[in-house]
Amino acid sequence: MIKKILTYCAEQLNSYLSRYYHRPQGLAEVGHIGQRTGEIPNKVIVSLVNVERETAGGISNNVQTYGGSFTSSSAPFLLNLKVMFATVFEEKQYAESLSVFSKALAFIQSQQKFMVDNVKYTLTLETVSTFDFHNIWTTMGGQYYPSVVCKLTGVVIDSNEIKSSGSTAQNTEVQT
């Protein structure tokens, strides 16, 4: 599911950027930002940088009753994804990367809510301190590119596996 959501974001961003820049190979893709070897892609790279569990929706077991029986399963994971949009361009194209980065920010601002497979997701800009950005980029290989981190909410991971089942009490009287 995570791959599908990030791919959708990259495809929509690519479609948006194609209004302003005409590149047959596109300008956005899902990828790993750090430790690049070889050719620089000259694109906006959409990359997952962190996953957080959302606890506001509750984390208790899911119990369902059916007549005189019940099933119990683990609560689904409600997740927030931290997604980085980075303009990974060659050094000589830095000015162009800033132009593309500005358009990418306009895309994020205009597409804060979207749907994939009838599930609604929200994409919001995160405020990341210079210190935290330094840590992120150091972890990913040290080469900095103009970038922003967004919080993507609405991701649910649910295995739908039943942990236990049983039957409910049929007699409510207590014998002594």
Where are the predicted features?
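A broadly used, surface-exposed interaction patch
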Residues: 55-85
